[in-house]
Amino acid sequence: MGKSRGDKYRDATDGKKDAKKDLNELKQELAMDEHQISLDELYARLGTNPDTGLTSEQAKTRLDRDGPNALTPPKTTPEWVKFCKNMFGGFSLLLWIGAVLCFIAHGIPCWCAGEPYLYDNLYLGIVLAAVVVITGCFSYYQESKSSKIMESFAKLVPQYAVVIRGGQRIDAPAEALVVGDIIDVKFGDRVPADIRVIKASSFKVDNSALTGESEPQTRTAEYTNENPLETKNLAFFSTNAVEGTCRGVVVATGDRTVMGRIANLASGLEMGATPIAREIAHFIHIITGVAVFLGVTFFIIAFILGYYWLDAVIFLIGIIVANVPEGLLATVTVCLTLTAKRMASKNCLVKNLEAVETLGSTSTICSDKTGTLTQNRMTVAHMWFDNKIFEADTSDDQSTANYSRASSTWMALSRIAMLCNRAEFKPGEETNPVLKRECNGDASESALLKCVGLSIGGVTGYRTDKPKVAEIPFNSTNKYQVSVHQTDDGDERYLVVMKGAPERILDRCSTVLMEGQELHMDDQWRESFNNAYLELGGIGERVLGFCDLRLPADKFPRGFKFDIDEPNFPIEGMPFVGLMSMIDPPRAAVPDAVSKCRSAGIKVVMVTGDHPITAKAIAKGVGIISDGNKTVEDIAAERGVPVSQVNPREASACVVHGSDLRDMTPAQIDEILENHSEIVFARTSPQQKLIIVEGIQRMGAIVAVTGDGVNDSPALKKADIGVAMGITGSDVSKQAADMILLDDNFASIVTGVEEGRIIFDNLKKSIAYTLTSNIPEITPFLIFILADVPLPLGTITILCIDLGTDMVPAISLAYEEAEDIMKRMPRDPFRDKLVNERLISMAYGQIGMIQASGGFFVYFVIMAENGFWPSRLLGLRKQWDSPAINDVADSYGQEWTYTQRKRLEYTCHTAFFASIVIVQWTDLLICKTRKNSIYQQGMWNHHLTFGLFFETTLAIFLSYCPGLEHGLRMMPLRWTWWLPVLPFSVSIFIFDEVRKKFLRTLPPGNWVERETNY
């Protein structure tokens, strides 16, 4: 039995509900307990053996059941669908309708009379169709170029993994891993699946792409947190192992991994229309409304005036088509493409042309911290020794060091940092500046290595001369690292060096090194230590303590066997040497970029997975939290009261912890967004980033989200515009984004915002310029119907304007320099439209009417010079257009044949065309600016100067080129017929300069602004 229609409908509805339900489930925090239960219980659940792993048969069965360990590729739009969207979407649809109407207008006389009266409508229909096809192909080509760049990015999935199968240690393709496999991961590998750690040796992973934490995270077999993303006994698919080794059991593969869930969350989100797409749709509604209104009105008038119904229908179609700005689709496409190219040269790759303008509409930027605002490179920022805090010198020549590099305490501190350190420079990096050298090892240890490499130099040789004989690696229980070294400095004693958490190091020290002297550790010194530790930790820096000790030669002679499992050498009673603190520093250009955003009315919100203290410190460093603005915690600390006693609305800044966000309702999130101007969200999960973006969008903001990690991809997809990082960004984030920063620099976004605002302004100018000539193109047709005069302007001539003389000048406005755009508030997408009633009023009702008046003046002048006074022209249409009448008398009684009349009519068409070109000169100049005088703006846009030259040259060519009187019905003009329209052109310039003077000088909100400022 087949399903009834009702059943099918219910199935479809249920499918949508299920999809929505699945998406809501993905938005929930991770629900898993594999990290909480004991290992034995986990082995039993997964049916595996920690020593022998799975058998080949078990692995094959599970692979068949669960599928390969790979992320399902995101659904891509078929190329033919992309092509059709460019061919039939938005503005193209209006032109297609125009083309169809032209074919109908051509076909009606053919159908009724057996042969067409004129081929104008056929030509117009063909040209309209050609315009759509050419611009559609052009847009498709631009988008496909961007997608090819996207396809060239590296693949995410690791290729091979070391797995225990049937007791054998083998290399297997990562895609063949299944739940229950026992795998080994070592330094340099990419974790091939979600694993529960069974045992680990100094194992650290870089989780920055997944959680946003800039420091490598230690992974051990112990369960430390109920949150799967924060516990130490889980390592996740596609994160990188940066130190040590680990054995683990696979608990999830493919789409069921944390990475897979996030990727599915991103691909499951629905994307709304871009602001520019909504603007173009709004514009089409306006143009269609005006066209249909005029068409129907004059159809009724023509009917009342006694026109035959067939003629009235052709009039109706003609007026609708005359309202269609044929060249505007090409103009908008080319303008967006030019801006996209300009942005690409400034390191912004636009995947979708419409995203160009969206960035300019942005009112809130949600930025990731690690790698976007910061350099994703841990750097030593401060040192504390000899009871003073010193700023680290990061200059290549060490010219800004404010401490003595010869200080014995500094030499001792740098010696420990060099020796108690597993990081090393990669081979072949010797010729590069120290700060730019690639390192193998932990990010913090690499920072120490570069710091002492800059200050002391020769790290590799120094280590060779002082070989390591024993080492206790750092672990999360002891929180320190110890190594024992032989030295070549004439001292036969072994040197023990130690670094770690400052409080743990302090516990193992009884004296302190001060200016080369070993002194007793008193309470005053301890207070200084605590103050320094709190100060450095309070600005978000990771602080490490350092100490060393010479072992007595009689007890520890050369060749002594050191035991690291149960140390047989002293690791207490050591002299404390100093502190060194590190931070992932902000990018140099970011503070200025944030300042520009603020002056442009754009709110910058930090959303990071990193620690709140670090996030707050970076936010203050880059200006997201301004100087003087305080959080609730700052106010409470100042007053010496609990945080609960401070009204949150007193604080303009706010740092929200992910654990607090988890328990908030949408209304509470909205309250935070409304009441705080400067916001930092820290320790957020990918699901929470998405919820934050949705909350900001609920406030009516247009949101741009920046990020490089997989954890950013759902938010990137949901945002009005997602901006991914090209260098450090994951493939998942690049797929989800609309734009890619090729240099990973937040400052490039501000460039993008500026370009987006410029293009919105310049598109307005182009549209205003293009629409204005619609009135002198439509009114001849209306007068032709109402006054029954010979047609002042032909259809073919209109095409010469729309697709000829107007095109290059309209496109040249895309190059116009900005007026105060980065000092304005972001545009309100609901009120500040690309085409609003004020623009229509200016283009159609004011400038357009002056242009039409100029055209009619020229028309009547030429007719009068040839004997037809205006009074004689009224009601003359039927006689004039009849091929059978060859004796139409003019005002002086001279008789005109049909051929003579048509030659005069085509001369009038050409003159009307020339007059439109001349008034469009001035229209182009006044469209250069929206408020500034042309004398303020200047004529520095050379493309516009070329546009003026081009349209004039083309008009002269079309008017005087032999043979065009047959193809385009263009007749040579007397030079005097170019002159009558000049006063109208000058009056347009004077009118608009006076209007702009009022806009600049009258108070904001004045009537001129309300009525004419588009």
From Swiss-Prot:
Which reaction does this chain catalyze? Answer: K(+)(out) + Na(+)(in) + ATP + H2O = K(+)(in) + Na(+)(out) + ADP + phosphate + H(+)
Q: Look up the domain of life of the source.
A: Eukaryota
Stated name of the protein = Sodium/potassium-transporting ATPase subunit alpha
Q: How does it sit in the membrane?
A: Multi-pass membrane protein
Organism phylogeny: Eukaryota, Metazoa, Spiralia, Lophotrochozoa, Platyhelminthes
Enzyme Commission number, as recorded: 7.2.2.13
Region entry Disordered, spans: 1-20, 48-73
Which Pfam family is one of those matched by this entry?
Hydrolase
Question: Which source organism?
Answer: Taenia solium
Protein role: This is the catalytic component of the active enzyme, which catalyzes the hydrolysis of ATP coupled with the exchange of sodium and potassium ions across the plasma membrane. This action creates the electrochemical gradient of sodium and potassium ions, providing the energy for active transport of various nutrients.
Biological processes per GO annotation: intracellular potassium ion homeostasis; intracellular sodium ion homeostasis; potassium ion import across plasma membrane; proton transmembrane transport; sodium ion export across plasma membrane
Against CDD domains, the record matches this protein to: HAD_like, P-type_ATPase_Na-K_like
Q: Where is the composition biased (Polar residues)?
A: 49-58
